[in-house]
Amino acid sequence: LKIKPLYIYLFYILAILLSLYSMLSAPMPFTVNPFMHILVVFFAYLLSFLLIFLLSLLVSDVLKLIFRLKRKTHLSILISLTTLLFLYTTINAFCIREKETQIQLPHLTKEIKAVQLSDIHLGHFRGENHLRKIVNKVNELNPDIIFITGDLVESHYNSDKQTIAPLKNLKAPIYFVDGNHDAQVGVEKLKNNLREIGVRVLENEFVDTLGLRIIGLEYMRPNKQTSDPLSVAERKTIQSIMPTIPVLDTMPTIVLHHTPLGSEYVSKAGADLYLCGHTHGGQIFPLTLINDKNFVYNRGLYKKGRLQIYVSQGSGTFGIPLRLGTNPEISLLILQSSL
């Protein structure tokens, strides 16, 4: 099968741009510089456009083969598809939807309306105004409790006190656990800033509220066999920490952790609900298909014996500001008694 030279050129260009973008967008203090910010945004959208162009080229070439399209028609389809897809994916990346899910829990004495926020990724593409919009949307839902399951920030740019300040306007108690990107930026500083505005940061501990036991885990590996250089505490694993935190049979237990890994240890401990994020649902088709293979729990609600697992697609994006085949979400979880 002969590959068109254009595809080869595009792959080379994308590889070079991806390398440059990875260096420019690395979570280093110098990226706070306004000039660096402009460079990061420019390369991100250039990379995004070329990815969409490559996908559109592939689709239009397949259509050309099937329907024997003339060159002019083929070119028109390519231009139209590239334009529409680029506009849709870049706009969709910032259009946050409320996704409601009903979850049955044992020993629950009353219905609880919970909101889960995950993977907001404050940084070069999202700042204080974006977070304020999320806060307003959450307040409109009138939740009883709010969980933030990591990756609140992704860059030194837009990760200061002022940027996260809108969170103090949330009208329900907030519980936070950190993610891998929080660790890259400086997790202790972020945690202290959150505490100052009234957010309860959970570090391998529990709190009882609303008839629920909430366990919050730091970002960590599921077990010692798993390698992860970004793990906050190298000696800690979900396998080693979960047995040290009491789980009661008389009230529902919810465990917060950034990634859906380690669910077997959460299940073994006797927890009822595991709230996670990290995956973004794959974020961009066809990466969504790869993510479905890489993560047993990629997006939405799953059941593993007694344990239910909810994986949020996140409210932001990782890397480039595109969403295709997934939607940024605010997860509205209606917790109801299973009895």
How should each PLM-predicted stretch be described?
Residues 32-40, 65-118, 123-140, 159:
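N-terminal signal-anchor transmembrane helix
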Residues 104-339:
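Soluble catalytic domains of enzymes that build or remodel membrane lipids, polysaccharides, and related
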